[in-house]
């Protein structure tokens, strides 16, 4: 059985993956790499208060971070 923290992290990651895969049509593997290398993901893993924010709030942060990335560069950091 997973902890509440793990469950919240899965929800947030799935929200970011859904945005990249279903809305922007990125391949799943590339999307997973982008999410896991993002500053938003690292903030989620390090800050419990941020992890408890709503998915729309976190997704908005991820979208802003993603918008600052050059189209040819898949790395969000």
Where are these regions (language model features)?
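C-terminal alpha-helical interaction appendages
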Residues: 1-77
């Amino acid at each position: 059985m997973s902890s509440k923290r793990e469950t919240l992290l899965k929800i947030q990651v799935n929200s970011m993956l859904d945005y990249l895969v279903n809305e922007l049509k990125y391949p799943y593997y590339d999307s997973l790499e982008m999410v896991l290398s993002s500053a938003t993901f690292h903030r989620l893993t390090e800050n419990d208060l941020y992890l408890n924010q709503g998915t729309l709030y976190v997704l908005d942060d991820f979208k802003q971070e993603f918008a600052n990335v050059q189209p040819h560069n898949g790395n969000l950091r």
